[in-house]
Curated annotation (Swiss-Prot):
Primary role: Catalyzes the reversible adenylation of nicotinate mononucleotide (NaMN) to nicotinic acid adenine dinucleotide (NaAD).
Gene Ontology MF annotations: ATP binding; nicotinate-nucleotide adenylyltransferase activity
Protein name: Probable nicotinate-nucleotide adenylyltransferase
Taxonomy, superkingdom: Bacteria
Top EC class of this enzyme: transferase
Keywords: ATP-binding, NAD, Nucleotide-binding, Nucleotidyltransferase, Pyridine nucleotide biosynthesis, Transferase
Catalytic reactions on record: nicotinate beta-D-ribonucleotide + ATP + H(+) = deamido-NAD(+) + diphosphate
UniProt similarity note: Belongs to the NadD family.
Species in which this protein is naturally found: Citrifermentans bemidjiense (strain ATCC BAA-1014 / DSM 16622 / JCM 12645 / Bem) (Geobacter bemidjiensis)
NCBIfam families assigned to the protein according to its UniProt record, in alphabetical order: cyt_tran_rel, nicotinate (nicotinamide) nucleotide adenylyltransferase, PRK00071.1-3
GO biological process, one term: NAD biosynthetic process
Amino acid sequence: MRLGILGGTFNPIHNAHLRIAEEARDLYQLDRVVFIPAATPPHKPLVGELSFASRLEMVRLAVADNPGFMVSDMEGVRGGRSYSIDTLRELKARYPDDDLFFIVGADSFNDISTWREYEAIFELCNVISVQRPGSTITSLAEALPVAIAGEFCYDPAAKRLNHCSGHAVYALDGVLLDISSSHIRLSVQGGRSIRYLLPDAVEHYIKEQRLYVDAR
């Protein structure tokens, strides 16, 4: 099975997250995409002190009608800081015969050298970097940490960077929805509409639970 992995704080999950996952699933012929909310993200503090349980429930509501999507609470169950390398190793242990595709944003990919054991990520799985409009696989190659750049070679026919482990780095283009979780939180706080920015079920949950009313 080809399994996509999309992690994040999902505070809250919105339509751009879902569109990224769907485009990756379609373009790279992924059998499933698993959404994994971070319990305690190591690189940025959670805004609004929203519980893991609330963020997990919003993700469940968001993906409920798509059989190609699934949700995992593994980072909440594991506890502690949510390091991607730990999650990827756990997934590889659970699904040793599956091909893993780790989906990350361009900003995250550009900062990947700051991640714990980032070198091992490319040995465990393929990486799909969601690029800004106009970016190319060449700019993706330039973002590789110098320490490991020599482990990759450019495959122009496939438009990917092949890693010596047999995995690859792909550039996903064309996801143009300019939606951010911070904008949604501020809109809720200011009493503005968030309709069409996220699934209806998630919007209703936010209103029912009075989430983000005082968050920034």
